[in-house]
Structures are given as C-alpha cells and as structure tokens.
Amino acid sequence: MFIAIGIFFVFLLLGMPVAFSIGLSGFSFFMIRDLPMTVLVQKSISTSQSFTMLAIPLFILAGNLMNSCGITKRLMRFANACTGHMYGNIGQVSCLMSTLMGGVSGSAVADASMECRILGPEMTRLGYDRGWSAAINGLSGLIVATIPPSMGLIIYGTVGEVSIGRLFMAGWVPGILMCVLLMLAVTWSARRFGYKPEHDHPAPLSEILKALLDSIWAILFPVLLIVLIRFGIMSPTESGSFACAYALLVGTVFYHELTWESLLQTLRDSVKDITVITIILAFSGVFGYGIVFDNITVTIANALLGITSNSAILLLLVVVFLLICGMFMETTVIALILTPILLPVMRSIGVNEVVFGMIMMTTVTFGVMTPPVGTALYAVSDIMECPIEETFKKGWPFYLVIVGVILFMIFFPQAVLFLPNLVYGA
C-alpha cells in the first residue's frame, strides 16, 4: 500500500486532479496485489451509495441555495451594525460573518473567497492594506471548519464512525473562541495600522435589533439543526434534506429573492460541486480498502509509538503532518484518506475521537492558508491583487491566533468536550 500512496503523491505533484490521483493509486494497489477487479468496482459503488454520505451533497445544495436567497447580505448588514464602532470594523465584519456563515456555506475556502469578493473592495476603498485584508478574510474562514454543519466534520464522523451530533456540538467552543480572538487581533493590528472605526459610537439598539430580525432565519438555521439532531427528530443525513427545504422556504416565502433563474443557476453550480465530491468519495473507497487490507494503521501506530509514548507529543507530531497535508490537498480529501489511518492510532494512545476530529479539521483547513502552497492563500491573495508574501507578513497576528486555538484544543480537551457532554452525556 505504501507504493500506492507514493504513486498518489507523484500524480498529485504532476498536477493530476485529486480524484483521479486517488483512483489510479487505488487501481495500482489492486494490480500490484493481483486482487480481483470486481472488488474495486464494488468498493467504488458502495462508498458513493452510503446513506450517511448523502448529507454532503444535500448540505452543498443547501449552502448554495442560502447564498442565492439574500441571506449573505443580511448577515453582513447585521455584522456591520454590531462592529461599526470597532477599529478595523470591516475586518471585524469578516470574523463575525464567518461565524454566522458557518451554518450556511460549510466550506472554509468558499467562505474565504466569498468574503474577499464582498468585503475586499470596501476594505481597499477605506485604505486597508491589501495583504492585511486578504489575511483576515482568509483566516476568518477557518471558523467555518468548526461551526456546524462543517463538511469536513460530516466526512470525518462518517468515515471514522464518530457521532456527528457530538462533533457539531464540539465545534461551538473552538469556533466562538477563534472568532473572539481574531476580533481582538483585528483590533490590535488595526490600531497599529491606523484603521479607525467607521462610527464614533456603537449603533443604536434599535438598528442592531432591526438587522438581527432581518437575518434571523439564517441565524436560527444552525440552532434548529442541533436541536433536531439532539432530540432524535432527524439524523444528520435527514437534516441535510431539512436544510434544503429550509433554504427554499426562506428564499421564496420570507425573503422573496429566490427566482426561477437563480434557482436553476444554483442547481447547476451544486451539480458541479457534488460531482467532484462524489468522484472523490467513490475512489477513496478503493484507497481505504487498501489501507485496511495491508493493516497500515497498525504499522503507523507502531512507528509513532516507537518515537515516544507521550500522547501530547504524538498529537503535536500528527498536527504538523496534517498541516503539511493541508497545504497540498483539499480538506475533504484529507478527511477521507487520513481519518481511517490516523483515528485508530489516536484512539490507541487515549486521544478522544471528538477532540481529534476538531483538531484535525481545524489544522488541515489552516493548511490551505499556510505558505508556501496553501490553496486558499493563493485564492484570497489573487482576489485582493497582492503577493502571498504580503498576506503572510501583514497577517501574522491572525496566524498566531489559529495556532493558539489548535494548542488550546490539544492541551485542554475537556473544554472542547464541555458542550457535547452537557447535551449528550459524558
């Protein structure tokens, strides 16, 4: 299997699409081991037909529907009303928007790119440095990796057979902590660069309440999701169907902004996104079969335990590895490929599976904004028309915040487990 893994990385470095890199490396494993090709076909089909995995395309469609029905601009108006009196207030809007959008987009890269396109021109007009703007818009998108319904957490929970409901609850503490610390970092750096508040005093309570009521349907969505899953009214997969119906209802009945034209365009965009994910899912089943067949998890566990038996040090080593992987691959791909490898190892050294899921998805999402090759780093820098060096140089306080949150989850796991244990029991 190690040869197949090597082939995967070679194809990846040659620029082959991730889905086909996974598929061809899995095919090479079957060829090397002289296994029946019927198993390869069966694994591809059975993985893509998983009922639990159905949540992924449903949430992708729901996220696209919500973005088309006017929720984004209403959330931005509410965030701006709350932060207009703060230093670097458009940067503060970015942090608050990511927290509110966690239940809408589910994708950190999509959230970062969207916020750069929406907030970037206004930041430039107000004289904000382009690199600083790119950094905060990109790194605030990491909040989406923790706030439900994160796509990465759904995949991790499905592949690793971990409670998705507990993962969703666990995301709130690190997600809100990340938001608060990023807002403090924005205040500090905005004072340093002279980015003054847009208003001299906080907005009137009436204005904030008006903006809140206008965006209440978006804010209620993740809360309803958690409640419905917690009380067994619906499974995580069924909640994806609820999310689509909810988005259609909000867009047509309450906001009146979802037209036939925008609905058709949303369906087209969703089909493109879902097709890519489905191909990756199908081929990852073949790849995962090879991991189980060759007992790779035991080999890696023994190798890691040969270095040290200290669980904290082992977890730090795994975090560094995940960060490097995140620079090169999409978070969904990493969750599909590495969860069956790393999760048994973490369980064997006593690391809680829910805590590891939060650490894993935050770290790999951080990787997409980490130089030298983070995909989201290039995306936001390109949108803001600045070199990636400038983004990293001006955004170092925000990078330190994310590192701090990851270390917090490693050394204070009970804080991450507080809400899941409170809601579901220890």
Residue ranges and their predicted role:
Residues 1-426:
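Alpha-helical transmembrane segments of multi-pass membrane transport proteins
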